[in-house]
Curated annotation (Swiss-Prot):
Gene Ontology MF annotations: manganese ion binding; RNA binding; RNA-DNA hybrid ribonuclease activity
Protein name: Ribonuclease HII
Pfam families found in the cross-reference section: RNase_HII (PF01351)
NCBIfam families per record: PRK00015.1-1, PRK00015.1-3
The enzyme's E.C. designation: 3.1.26.4
Domain named RNase H type-2: residues: 26-209
Main EC class the enzyme belongs to: hydrolase
Length: 209
């Protein structure tokens, strides 16, 4: 059971959705990405439609949750029959080809296309997304909007799982720990072993090698 405080906190994150509902839209998807900054691995986007009026206590920006909390919330969301979500993955090769910003937009478009239900409005974290569906950019939306926060949780957990799989193929780099971000340990591994196939060749630390 969730507490009254948790319920109120969640409801405070549905204000943007309620404003859009009041304008006559009925199916609202939150959209977010993870993995723009890492030196390795794909960029992943999530799109999520939450059922109106249902409380999901604990939904928050994925970066503000512990791994345990995030995993628990991911399981709650993806196993709820009233929650609809889609995931988009854009490869390292594609990132290097079109740049990370365009790759992020592409991942978002794929995530939206992969939703099992078609939304009629999009709330997008931080980016203006050219799309045939009406959309609104929300700065720091993953901490303000419930559906964007849910999308961020689903995308983050999905990408972390992919990076753990890459660790099995390339164990020298520690992808299971830093998930491709440019930590001191990752930079040291790059210096020792050079880049592997899943490193982003267009990113400065790898491009300079």
């Amino acid at each position: 059971m969730h507490t009254l405080v948790e319920e109120q906190l969640f409801l405070s994150k549905t204000i943007f959705e309620e404003e859009v509902f009041s304008e006559g839209f009925s199916i609202i998807a939150g959209v977010d990405e993870v993995g723009r900054g890492p030196l390795a691995g794909p960029v992943v986007a999530g799109a999520c439609i939450l059922p109106r009026g249902k409380i999901f206590a604990g939904v928050n920006d994925s970066k503000k949750l512990s791994p345990k909390e995030r995993g628990r919330m991911r399981d709650i969301l993806v196993n709820d029959p009233d929650v609809y979500y889609g995931i988009g993955v854009v490869s390292v090769e594609r990132i290097d080809e079109i740049n990370i910003l365009e790759a992020t937009k592409e991942a978002m478009a794929v995530a939206i296309a992969n939703l099992p239900v078609h939304p009629d409005f999009l709330l997008v974290d931080g980016l203006h997304l050219p799309h045939k569906i009406p959309c609104k950019k929300i700065i720091k939306g993953d901490s303000k909007v419930a559906s964007i926060a849910a999308a961020s949780i689903i995308a983050k957990e999905y990408r972390d799982d992919l990076m753990r799989e890459l660790h099995q193929r390339y164990p020298d780099y520690g992808f299971d720990k830093h998930k491709g971000y440019g930590t001191a340990a990752h930079l040291a591994a790059l210096k020792a072993f050079g880049p592997c196939d899943c490193h982003r060749k267009s990113f400065a630390p790898i491009r300079r090698r």
